[in-house]
Amino acid sequence: MIKSKSIWSPNKSRGEYKNYILVIGESARRDYVHSFGGKYSNTPWLDSAPAMIFDNYISAGPSTMISLTNTLSLRKGSVLELNNNVVTLASKAGFETWWLSNQGSKGHFDSPISLIGHSADYSEFIKSGSSDDRLISPDENLLPLLDVALNKNKNENKLIVLHLMGSHPKACIRTNNTYDIDVGAKEVSCYIKSIEMTDQFLSKVISLANQTGESWSVMYFSDHGLSYVNKDTQGAYLTHGDKTKENYEVPFFIINSNSEIKEVVHQPRSALDFMTTFSQWLKISDRNIPSACNMLSNENCSNEDYVIDFNGNYIKFNDLPSV
């Protein structure tokens, strides 16, 4: 449990929508997502959805722990303040908060993220052990929990966070060894399928949100990308790395209950500035959060080119090769 209280003192906000649903994906490379230019047709729902697509969004780090702690928490210099996170910010602003996770709560690398999750008013972790166990745990198991969250305390404005297993290696565990598109390497074929499964999951999230009859906004991003091992061979697979752009290039989009057309934000956006993006999404202002640039637009914002490597160093994303 996080013992230090948050320092947030935001304006009270009811946001523009009744229910805000933040879906945190796992290990999805942007170039494997059809809606973001991937060549494999694996996102039929998102392809036709009137979403705001961010096609130059980069993750904060190359792994779940590095990425999400630096995405979801306030940073002062090189110091992370886990108590000052998106959940506690939303709570202080008047939202009822939920954290529903299909990732672990007890593994070494899970712990900082689960601490953030446990700061919600309601939290539930489907996997009681570590996220790195090799057991099948479909993300669809989160849907009944989401249904409960949406329909409990209907008078409350809510932030509901869904943390997926998504495309976490090994991908064939995620898909139960099934795939539709055979690219000659089984793990890569499963990886393509795992992204299609996330697309199907997201369509069901939207369906549940619609069933409430209330307004909603859904934001999705993947925590990080992956890199190739044995590329272009039958034994090719994708795993964590920090040496290429593809380790950080991830899908990010927002869709609302009143969205009518697809929009594209081409300007670079970094997850290191996610606290600003998040606060603007929920219509929250706080003196501790920079707000000079409109992240939810095509405004040219500065310093959107940095990421963190495995050693905790800040590096320039554009200096990395693309492989």
Q: What residue spans do the PLM features occupy?
A:
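DG-centered beta-turn motif at the end of beta-strands
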Residues: 24-28, 220-225
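Active-site-proximal alpha/beta segments of enzymes that process anionic O-linked groups
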Residues: 1-23, 27-178, 249, 271, ...
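Extracytoplasmic/periplasmic, Sec-exported soluble proteins
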Residues: 38, 78-82, 134, 138, ...
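C-terminal, low-complexity/hydrophilic appendages and adjacent surface loops
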Residues: 244, 313-323
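A long, amphipathic alpha-helix that forms part
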Residues: 2-11, 144-151, 179-221, 253
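Short, surface-exposed, charged loop/turn segments at secondary-structure junctions
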Residues: 175-182, 234-236
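Active-site rim elements
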Residues: 73-76, 186-195, 206-207, 237-241, ...
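Histidine-centered active-site microenvironments of extracellular/periplasmic hydrolases
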Residues: 37-41, 210, 214-215, 221-257
